[in-house]
Amino acid sequence: MTKRPVLIKEAILVNQAFETIDECLEQSGKLLVDNGDIEPEYILSMKEKVEQHPYTTYLPGAGVAIPHGMSEGFKYINHTGISVLQIPNGVDWLGEKVFIVIAIAANSDEHMNVLASLGDSLESEEDAKNLWKTNSVDKIYDILS
């Protein structure tokens, strides 16, 4: 995989509204497809992860979901990348209200590095809430970069 930015501004959408997890996965996956990070099949892998290992796809109490694919889906990743959906009114994610969806496309070698980096970016509840409240792609980009 060639080295390129993991997050680009074109992969961030603010002021979104979704009714279901599935809609979130479709849109976040579409952003990754449009940027060449994944093949469409990886979206199915993200859906499988939510179904089979649901509690590995969000941060309880933080209002943040971090969907990613199963290891079998790694073959559909072209480049490590993330997409971000900001949902001001939230969406129900396994009984929790989620306001930010950060979809990850990373192979096993890079997956933990991406998660650690996101963890650093969302270290405080205040940082997470800033993501929920801003209307600025630039601000979300700055917080997560």
Segment roles from a protein language model:
Residues 1-145:
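Cytosolic covalent-transfer regions centered on His/Cys nucleophiles
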